[in-house]
Amino acid sequence: MDRPVRELNLELGRPDAAEALRRLAAEVEAARKMGTPAMKLVHGYGSSGKGGRLRTACRTWLRQQELCFLPGEEFSIFNQEARRWLALCPRLRQDRDLDAENRGDTFVLLEKRKKGGKL
């Protein structure tokens, strides 16, 4: 599974949550067709300091689609789940946000998640 990771900037153009989710759904479908193993979603953290609307909407949608995702704030070599992701998709090691605790990103594996949401 050492194919490139696709990055999707959902903040581009400052869409509302509904438009961002439409783009997300289309991009996930396209990435799956291309055999892309994982995606990095850039949705921002929001100006309120509590997590933005895009971040919340994206993570809710990913749960509803039963996709396995890893919040950017957990994307660290010190996180056991993140280490499993790095083993499955070695290209993720090249991501500039590894160990950055970036709450404005979410990583997605493009397969249905296992029972309990873990790999």
For the regions a language model picked out, list residue spans one by one:
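Long, charged, low-complexity intrinsically disordered regions
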Residues: 1-119
